[in-house]
């Protein structure tokens, strides 16, 4: 309706899905202070403050993120936020890529959400929540699974930083060096 009429409007809501669907720009406030302004996509992909990182989307806050494979502790950044889409949960033995970056976990909860399953997994005493497509084999509570966490947001008291899993490296990568030789030359293999 707002688009059809061509008017500017302010819409106040606590429903994130509604806000990101109708807004061209979002302003997130915390106790009367503006935490971040931007398009819904900018805010979702680049949360500036710890409050925004924890507020926008579905998140799990983790204190000991350095116990997760591929993530080293950064000084003064004591907590991390992990979103479900940052996690891949596979049945044991079914992870096709980045096996060296994954770790084993135990499923502690499974919730049917209509178009997906939300799966809570305990990894080294840390519980994280990931999503799993209904097209994949079902996973049950108590089952051992492989968990790959691609990235997370770490934060200090004021700012949020995106951290990628340092263990995620392609396996079986080969490097070729090409040498241009203008004259016949003998190459010895060492």
Model-found features: residue ranges?
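ABC ATPase nucleotide-binding domains
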Residues: 1-48
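Residues located in well-ordered beta-strands
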Residues: 39, 51, 104-106
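Glycine/charge-rich catalytic "coupling/switch" loops of P-loop NTPases
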Residues: 60, 65-110, 136-178
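Short, conserved beta-turn/loop elements at beta-strand boundaries and strand-helix junctions
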Residues: 110-116
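SH3/SH3-like beta-barrel fold
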Residues: 119-121
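Beta-strand/loop nucleic-acid-binding surfaces
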Residues: 126-137
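Single conserved hydrophobic/aromatic residue that forms the stacking wall/gate
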Residues: 179-190
């Amino acid at each position: 309706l707002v688009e059809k009429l061509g008017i500017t409007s302010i819409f106040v809501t606590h429903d994130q899905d509604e806000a990101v669907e109708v807004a061209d720009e979002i302003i997130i406030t915390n106790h009367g202070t503006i935490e971040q302004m931007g398009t819904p996509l900018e805010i979702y992909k680049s949360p500036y403050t710890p409050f925004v990182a924890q507020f926008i989307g579905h998140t799990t806050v983790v204190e000991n993120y350095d116990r997760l494979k591929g993530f080293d502790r950064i000084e003064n950044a004591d907590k991390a936020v992990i979103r479900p889409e940052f996690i891949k949960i596979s049945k044991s033995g079914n992870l096709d890529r980045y096996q060296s970056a994954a770790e084993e976990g135990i499923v502690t909860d499974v919730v049917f959400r209509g178009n997906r399953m939300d799966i809570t997994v305990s990894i080294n005493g840390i519980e994280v929540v990931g999503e799993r497509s209904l097209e994949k084999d079902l996973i049950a509570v108590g089952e051992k699974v492989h968990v790959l966490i691609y990235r997370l947001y770490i934060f200090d008291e004021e700012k949020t930083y995106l951290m990628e899993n340092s263990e995620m490296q392609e396996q079986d990568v080969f490097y070729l060096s090409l040498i241009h030789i203008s004259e016949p030359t003998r190459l010895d293999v060492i």
